[in-house]
């Protein structure tokens, strides 16, 4: 099974079902319902789950359904929608809360997309509690409802869609990927995002807006802007915050691993029991180890045929992916981010799987034999043609970017040559586990080209004997043995002959092209070129000088300063009898001594390093200047945005501190930018506390002003409401009319009503459905007590109450109080350092003592604390007085101050005042119209 046992990143879990009938439950009868009615009813049931996030996927499904509908007759079945909805509603009304139900559904969704490693499979219950073991979701019957072990209801809705608890949808409408989507609560979505990305939300997650115009790091799911669609750079995560706290719409898209691909293959062959499953595995093992072709039912061939087909979804998403990549590049360029922070290490990250043989082979199939339907064995046999024709010659191979992958590949090539000589008639599959091809290897039947894939390393210079003549059409003549030699540690190329020399006839090898900086433009699709001027535009007639000039400006070769250092190093190497390989860890020299690879020492996590570098782009200061600005803080040196960025980089964890302290490097320039910055900041004591207190110092004035203004307005509004006599009389009129309406009911026995009843006056309409109780009250007051018509003029301050409620004012006040406590603690800490320094003036180690001349924290923060803390205490007392005033007002109007917020309390009165004013204006307009008509 090793020919299949590779990390094929395609979707094979959801397979086309053989059952086209729709069932509601285990005991229901078959419903003769064709596919179009099934699709229409499913769209009606899942209407709430469809959004712009899914438009691209649903567009492809709708096109497919429309094509199928042309060949089928439609027969209506009205039972399916009602039975399905009632069944799910009954199952979800159990003991679980909405939070527990959503959490179980999302956990089961991730569980069902994990590899099933046991022989039995995954346990699923039917409605009658009978057990069923499955190896993939394709084994679920369409229309049947099952339960997971957490009692989450699950149904396979159609060929490629499975719904869990009517909350989460697992969908795979292509053979490339799967998606998990739905609408969940914010907390549940946060947990799901952390499970999918394997990263805590508190560490920061980089999102782009849907149109690719904004890139931002989010630390809380609540910070998402309502109705805006966000996605990450590789389009695997999409989120949308819905209005009115309806939840978060999400979509996670991923690829299946090799175990899931194996299980999908087995599910496709429909094994009846574990013994059949074992027998299939044994047959695959025999296929791999035997030199004969597999004679059984090759399930693998059906899936491998699908590898060469490019899905329509991938073609449609190319423009969007290109736009997002350009957005990230524009963001980095606009923020002037240093590109050196990118990792140049050849080690593969933990979360990233190395490229597989199948991935590389598919790319080579598309490049070399595009348009043909040859099998995988034909590709391998074509790769063996050259060794068969030249069995006694040395083989020249292209070098990959990773030195670790060259050795297994050469071993595998030797094995391929031996296998070909032994059995020329058969084409057995090679050992895929040992054969490791890099996607950068270029094998050509005509000649051998060598391409360097390291961005910062120029191609090796020409070395060796005079070149062979230019290769004729295939089969090519064998190169001289002295010209090209195969060496696992070094690859020699023919040296370009000197123009002044007369030797060796024939042409010369084309020099290797230099790696260039890419120009990321938005390409026009081929189908749209005919509508543009580009279609008839003739190309520019260029020459060799153009290419040379462009390479001199934009190639990735080392800069002039590095070239000078190389020349000096070459001279010293010649004087030292070719001792150029002594510093092999940090520098690697080619045969001519013109190539130097200088690698950065990377210590931090990749995401952590990237985030720090993005935040550092806001500073136009050196790391030493940032440190000095923190120690000697002055207003204007660091802005609020810069302090927020510094706070986001902190704290430095104990693990990072130890790793940075014990790092082995000769010069700090060898470290990455993030590492250099943190090492510079590590010497500052209580770094994060300093940054937070400095940030508070810059913001405290505006915070106190805002609290003071809002508190004064709220206090005056409460006093105005308490002293309004007209409003009290209006309430009496309302009670009088309400008593008449409630006559003969238990509501008539009351002697008062709460203010939240005012909002219901607009909901109670007259028998002709044209007027409300508010209209009647306005008419009654206008005819009986007209002096009350303008009662809202005594409550004008209620309209000016700020949006923040009294509860928000008190909460902000408590936060400011905690900040002042933090400042006080830091002042005491630095005073203690100063005291210890005075006591240890005779200490021999002056570097470890507290140097007040370099630290102005006490000088800056002590006067600030004394001044603003006194002002805050006064404001704090004022807010407490307003709270007491509000509680008395609530009691005065019959409300419980413990069960109502100030926002709800005042909004009830304001809404009634607005409705009354609107009714009064309408009455005046009607009166004026009637007067004009009478005249």
From Swiss-Prot:
Residues 456-482 have a biased composition (Pro residues). Residues 506-935 form the FH2 domain. The keyword Coiled coil applies. Residues 35-76, 702-730, 803-834 form a coiled coil. InterPro entries: FH2_Formin, FH2_Formin_sf, Formin_Homology. SUPFAM superfamilies: Formin homology 2 domain (FH2 domain). Belongs to the formin homology family. Diaphanous subfamily. It comes from the Eukaryota. Residues 384-407, 568-583 have a biased composition (Low complexity). SMART domains: FH2 (SM00498). Residues 444-505 form the FH1 domain. This is Formin-I. Residues 418-428, 444-454, 484-499 have a biased composition (Polar residues). It comes from Dictyostelium discoideum. Formins play an important role in the nucleation of actin and the formation of linear actin filaments. Residues 431-443 have a biased composition (Basic and acidic residues). PROSITE patterns: FH2 (PS51444). Keywords: Actin-binding, Coiled coil. Pfam families: FH2. Residues 52-78, 380-511, 561-590 are annotated as: Disordered.
